[in-house]
A protein has these predicted regions:
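Alpha-solenoid helical repeat scaffolds
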Residues: 11-18, 33-43, 84, 88, ...
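Extended alpha-helical scaffolding segments
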Residues: 16-54, 60, 64, 68, ...
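Alpha-helical repeat/alpha-solenoid scaffolds of the HEAT/ARM/MIF4G superfamily
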Residues: 1-35, 39-142, 283-416
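Eukaryote-specific, cytoplasm-facing alpha-helical/coiled-coil scaffolding segments in long proteins
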Residues: 76-80, 92-103, 184-185, 265-271, ...
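Charge-patterned, phosphorylation-rich low-complexity C-terminal interaction regions
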Residues: 205-208, 469-508, 519-554, 575, ...
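Extended alpha-helical scaffolding regions
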Residues: 316-323, 328-371, 375-382, 434-439, ...
Length: 900
């Protein structure tokens, strides 16, 4: 019998204290009775009999309470047994000493007294042993497999306590096996108690030597437990393995360790940190390995060795390439050597001729990534994206350490970064990573001392890098570096601003020269591949810098707009020119829009509004461009554009509000929706080809890139729905694909559903039911008009499944979703009885089977609401039903779901 209302399972501080006091009472009772009453053959026999009987009860409350009492009683008795055992050994030693002192056959009162004491202890120990056996066999053996997980957990927790308290009696396979068996328990709570108990045992070296049999039997199970679906169990399993690794020689094989090392990349931070401790203590700080001593020794010997171990480990981890995750996992254990940036940069700048410590290219790339990850972790003070729910609030001490680290980073890299950039200036990946370091600078350091020469060196290197590279990641990092250093509040602003202006003058000069040649040469109709490449590079550089810096005074807008208009009229420009030109024009308008204020002249606003309209028309035109890349870029820009302007309008700026006159009309909404249908949800036909392994990898990579683009397009469109730029009813077309495309887009559609519901519960519910109604109508139209709806058809089954999945999105809080679910039923009933001729029940409503669809939402109704919905249904139904054939089955099923 399940009685779910008794003290031990009630929540709250009062009942928690009650349980603690109950357990303490049992311990105190035994302690107070241990001198005499405990052995009167009445009290304990009575209590043990009572608890054993109640522990076999069918009533859960009795069984749980008596099992807890019996286990705590045995724990207390074990302590008494331990004390008696100590006293007995002391008495025996005293007896032996006293006996040696007596000569001849003389009797001694003291000797007789000790002998009586020793026998008394033996008698008491026998009594206690009988009590322990009675409780263990009568309660533990029956209850450690109880159906209630709390009871099983109590048994395992206490047996672990007995083993730790009195290992001489309990530390053997006869008792350990129960903990081992329960490692396989279905409930995480029980598995957790097993692991915590084992941690207490494996943490004591004197006990580990007696665990050999248990370790050999259950090691594989423990090694697999960091994969446990319960996070806390996984973390404690990793901590247990750490203890086993430290205290049991060679218990973990190389394969076991390799498996466990990979958990440093897991998204769950506590598990990753536990794995980081395992990796650090087992691999990085291990002293007995070969190649540990660097050839040159010197100042950074220990740190250099650890860094090389870390780099080798990362390169050998074929499954993962996430340096930031690896560093975050090790941060709590290896913070000292991970903050040794002087060692890291010295290792990079050394030449192989000096002492043989130089790294190869792959090692250098990883070390630069490690430097960036450690700098970010030290400066930001929180885990990387995807690990940890939110940024943690730093304590005063942590904040102080963070500021000291930022200062240390700035002082060191101000001098070293220009040298590193000079050394690796031709390597795009290395340079892109190195250029991200200045964003973590404490710029106030520049005002102390005289770092002008270092700043000049940095700006000179960045300028050379921009000239050398066309890689987007390098250019973006360069533009961001200028943006970070160009903070107007700092002492270096004028110096950096001057360098930035000089660089952009040169970039614009190159672009203007190319554009002049382009227009003069038969107005752009004849362009060779070299010119296209140069134009692409020039436009790309300017676009990247325009993203981070306002280039309005260079009059870039007119130049790029002319290219877009030319493409609209003639359609002959290559994609490599169109995409950066489109991006430049977009950024130009964004900077102009950002400059609009309440005091802007009307002429400026009218001019800007005209340009906004022209650009939006260009983007809408490019939605039908022959090149897929141009279509997708135009769509993304248009979505962002609409979102930004809608936000601008929400700021209640009356002048700026005029910018929104054209947004978003029905025609534009239809175009956007049609674009999503064609580019996201329409499946491309795959040709069956015989591909080599290399070609298969490339094909798979292309598919992933294509999926990423589709997700970006869908997310951009869904944002418009969420922020009411596009009508919420447009989401109905998206929701239709929720189940069909769940693996690819399910998270985006679900988030859209959640956000729209948060904005407007009623309208969101109407959109859901509209989606199902449209699918139902399509299903009906696809069937033979003379036949009734086929409930077994694939399309109808898919509709029911979609409705069920929609129902699951409401969660368990029926009160919170009350209005939405009620609206779904109301709209569904009205649709089901649409075009019904009369209410006498003689004519079957054409949409009656739709009731089967909305019955999936019945379990989300509160009981009072079920009665209301049932009453609303009765308005459309005559009682009793004159016809009870199969055609009326949907109505009967729906009514039953409401009456359940």
């Amino acid at each position: 019998q399940d009685n779910e209302d008794y003290p031990l399972i009630r929540t709250g501080p009062y009942w928690k204290k009650f349980k603690a006091n109950f357990c303490e009472f049992i311990a105190v009772l035994v302690q107070q009775c241990q001198c005499s009453i405990l052995y009167d053959s009445y009290l304990m026999d009575t209590i043990i009999s009572l608890l054993t009987g109640l522990a076999d009860s069918m009533v859960r409350a009795f069984r749980h309470t008596s099992t807890l009492a019996a286990m705590k009683l045995l724990t207390a008795v074990v302590s008494v047994h331990l004390n008696l055992d100590v006293n007995k050994h002391n008495a025996q030693r005293l007896y032996a000493v006293e006996k040696k002192r007596i000569s001849g056959k003389r009797t001694n009162y003291r000797l007789e007294q000790l002998e009586r004491k020793r026998k008394e202890y033996e008698h008491k120990l026998l009594e206690i042993q009988n009590m322990m056996n009675a409780i263990f066999k009568g309660t533990f053996l029956n209850r450690y497999r109880d159906v209630i997980p709390e009871i099983r957990a109590t048994c395992i927790e206490e047996i672990a306590s007995w083993i730790k308290t009195y290992p001489d009696a309990f530390l053997n396979d006869s008792y350990l096996k129960y903990i081992g068996w329960m490692l396989y328990d279905k409930q995480a709570e029980v598995r957790l108690k097993c692991l915590l108990g084992l941690q207490g045992i494996y943490s004591r070296k004197e006990l580990v030597s007696r665990m050999d049999l248990f370790t050999s039997r259950f090691k594989d199970r423990i090694v697999s437990m960091p994969l446990d679906k319960d996070h806390e169990v996984a973390v404690q399993a990793m901590k247990l393995l750490m203890l086993m690794s430290q205290n049991c020689e060679d218990v973990l094989s190389a394969e076991d360790c390799e498996t466990l090392y990979q958990f440093v990349y897991t998204a769950h931070r506590p598990l990753a940190v536990a794995a980081g401790e395992f990796l650090y203590k087992r691999l990085l700080s291990h002293e007995g390995d070969e190649e540990v001593q660097p050839k040159g020794g010197g100042k950074f010997g220990a740190s250099t060795d650890q860094l090389k171990r870390l780099i080798r480990f990362f390169l050998e981890s074929e499954l993962h390439k996430h340096v930031a995750y690896l560093i975050d996992s090790l941060w709590d254990w290896a913070g000292k050597f991970l903050k040794d940036w002087e060692c890291m940069t010295t290792l990079l700048l050394k030449n192989a001729e000096e002492d043989g410590e130089a790294l190869n290219d792959a090692h250098e790339s990883v070390l630069i990534e490690i430097i960036l990850a450690t700098v970010r972790e030290a400066a930001e003070g929180h885990p990387p994206v995807g690990r940890g729910a939110a940024k943690k609030i730093l304590s005063v001490k942590e904040k102080k350490i963070q500021l000291e680290d930022c200062n240390k980073i700035t002082e060191h890299f101000i001098m070293v970064l220009p040298q590193l950039l000079a050394k690796y200036s031709t390597d795009a990946q290395k340079v892109a990573n190195l250029l991200q370091i200045p964003q973590y600078y404490d710029l106030d350091v520049y005002s102390k001392g005289h770092p002008e020469k270092h700043l000049d060196a940095l700006l000179r290197e960045v300028k050379d890098i921009v000239a050398k590279h066309s890689d987007m990641s390098v250019l973006e990092a360069s533009a961001r570096t200028y943006y970070i250093l160009c903070s107007e509040e700092t002492a270096i602003y004028s110096q950096v601003d001057s360098a930035r202006t000089q660089l952009i003058d040169e970039l614009m000069g190159q672009l203007n020269q190319l554009l002049d040649g382009f227009w003069q040469k038969e107005e752009g109709f004849c362009t060779d591949a070299g010119e296209i490449s140069r134009m692409h590079s020039a436009l790309g550089r300017v676009a990247v810098f325009h993203n981070a810096h306002d280039l309005t005074k260079w009059n870039l807008y007119d130049k790029t707009l002319r290219l877009l208009v030319f493409e609209m009229e003639h359609g002959s420009l290559p994609v490599l020119m169109i995409l950066p030109a489109l991006q430049c024009t977009y950024f130009s308008l964004l900077w102009q829009l950002a400059a609009v204020s309440e005091h802007s002249p009307k002429e400026t606003l009218f001019s800007l509004r005209r340009e906004l309209r022209r650009f939006s028309q260009i983007c809408m035109c490019f939605l039908h461009h022959k090149e897929k890349g141009v279509r997708e870029k135009a769509f993304m820009i248009l979505c962002d554009w609409l979102l930004i302007l809608s936000h601008q309008d929400s700021n209640n700026n009356e002048e700026a509000a005029g910018l929104l006159d054209y947004l978003p009309n029905t025609s534009l909404q239809e175009k956007l929706h049609l674009f999503i249908q064609e580019h996201v949800f329409v499946e491309e036909e795959e040709e069956s080809k015989d591909l080599t392994e290399e070609e298969e990898r490339k094909d798979e990579s292309c598919k992933l890139d294509d999926l990423h683009k589709k997700r970006s397009l869908l997310a951009a469109y869904c944002k418009l729905i969420v922020y009411n730029v596009v009508e919420m009813t447009a989401a109905a077309e998206i929701y239709k694909y929720y189940v069909k495309t769940y693996n690819d887009f399910g998270d985006i559609i679900k988030e859209t559903l959640s956000r729209t519901r948060h904005n407007n519960k009623i309208q969101s519910a109407k959109t859901l039911i509209l989606c199902l109604q449209q699918l139902f109508q399509t299903h009906v139209e696809s069937q033979d008009s003379s036949s009734s709806v086929d409930f077994s058809s694939a399309s109808f089954t898919n509709m029911k499944e979609l409705a069920r999945r929609f129902s699951l999105t409401f969660g368990w809080d029926q009160v919170k979703s009350r209005e939405s679910v009620a609206m779904i039923h109301k709209e569904g009933i009205e649709f089901a009885f649409q075009r019904a001729t009369g209410v006498d029940g003689k004519c079957l409503p054409p949409n009656l089977s739709f009731l089967l669809i909305i019955s999936e939402f019945s379990n989300k109704l509160l009981k009072p609401d079920k009665r209301l919905v049932y009453a609303y249904l009765q308005r459309y139904v005559a009682e009793p039903l004159p016809c009870r054939g199969d055609e009326w089955q949907p109505l009967i099923c729906y009514r039953n779901s409401l009456l359940a």
